Amino acid sequence: TGFIGVKLAGPPIVCFKEGTMIDIMDNNSKQETQVKVEDIRKGMYVKTYQHGFLPVKHVAFKTIENPETNDRIEKRLYICDQAKYPTLKEPLIMTGCHSILIDESEYTDIQKKMIREQNGMLFKTDDKFRLPVMYDDKAAPYCVKGEYKVWHICLEHFDQEMNYGIYANGLLVESCSERNICLAEYDHV
């Protein structure tokens, strides 16, 4: 399937390409709306899968170099399109370790094996399982070579290793944990 096995040498890069739209609560109207990930600031409220709207604790970014090859590796961008992900409002581009949240029945045996080799186990966010986009056959490597600014957000949580399900361009994905956002050498806003 073109997968290259990886062992992470540090915290994973779990980010959205600049321009990704995140579901939030508008501070003035108190209505749900979308805002570009790079425009999110600490204290804004992001829509979660099971916990309503929660405040942002950290906003961070970094620049990554994206190759033009089709290699399925962690440190690159992948694109998810509407034809394969019906809830998407527009294509979603994110880094290889960023997870889409799925039901356990959606995993393939190969995906389970690859994730266990990388992480030691399958991880959950709420009642959904995490599928790193680099292991999702429906996602394709984003083969536009260049430097890209990628962003992520961490929401308030009493446990710094936990995250939430959030909506990016309409797709249910993971937010970043406080631990990972602080260890991953991001620039904080």
Regions found by a protein language model. Give the residues of each.
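A recurrent domain-boundary module in secreted/ectodomain proteins
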Residues: 2-13
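Long beta-strand-rich cores associated with HINT superfamily self-processing modules
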Residues: 12-32, 45-188
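Structural motif
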Residues: 38-45
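Accessible peptide chain termini
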Residues: 1-2, 189
